[in-house]
Amino acid sequence: QRGILTSDNAQAIFIDTPGIHRPHHALDRNMLATARGVVQEADVVLWIVDVSRKPGTDERRVAQFIQQTNESCKVFIAMNKCDLLKPQNVISHSTMYRTLCPEALWMLVSAKRGDNVEIIKNEILDLLPIGPRYYDDNVITDKTVRELSGELLRESALHYLRHEIPHGIAVLIDEFIEDEGDKIEIMATLVVENSRHK
């Protein structure tokens, strides 16, 4: 899924990668291969971390993955959830994340409150190399409304079922009916990786 940000003098294409974790199944391996391909082609990697907690094995794995996959790209660490961080932990937690990617730019951010979001956006645009615009100014995604609906359903399912189904879920849109008003009727099938999750 691509999100397109266009300003007066720049255009950034954001590609959300699958989570980077140790693969156990074919789906995991495919997701990791997809993430690797995206990072290899990236000019800038925006790594969003939860700074309210210390980095663990997963964060170390992601840092290593980024650095080994594309040594030449710039990395920007958005240390999210700074609004949940206890004041006495600001320096220690941010230092731990900066140590994982010493060359990375970084900033504390609260996506919930909007703290530093505009600054990060502008920093990323400044890091991009000169190149052509690939999309018209009014385009914000390469997905159709039908595809976005599937993503929203998957996000909701993962939110409500996150303890039962960590990430192995896909959404197939069976019917997508738009009426003359603002209503859309959607029939979808949720596909899970493991049969015990049905």
Model-derived features: positions:
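Conserved, well-folded catalytic cores of nucleic-acid-processing
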Residues: 4-8, 23, 38-45, 69, ...
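Nucleotide and nucleotide-moiety/phosphate-recognizing core
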Residues: 6, 60, 73-75
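Residue-level signature of catalytic and energy-coupling elements of molecular machines
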Residues: 1, 16, 35, 46, ...
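Switch II of P-loop NTPase G domains
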Residues: 2, 12, 18-68, 87-90
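Conserved beta-strand segments of alpha/beta enzyme cores
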Residues: 11-13, 105
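Canonical P-loop GTPase G-domain recognition
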Residues: 67, 72-76, 82-147
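Conserved nucleotide-binding/hydrolysis micro-motifs of P-loop NTPases
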Residues: 18-21, 51-55, 81-85, 111-116, ...
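Long, well-ordered amphipathic alpha-helical subdomains in the mid-to-C-terminal portions
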Residues: 138-198
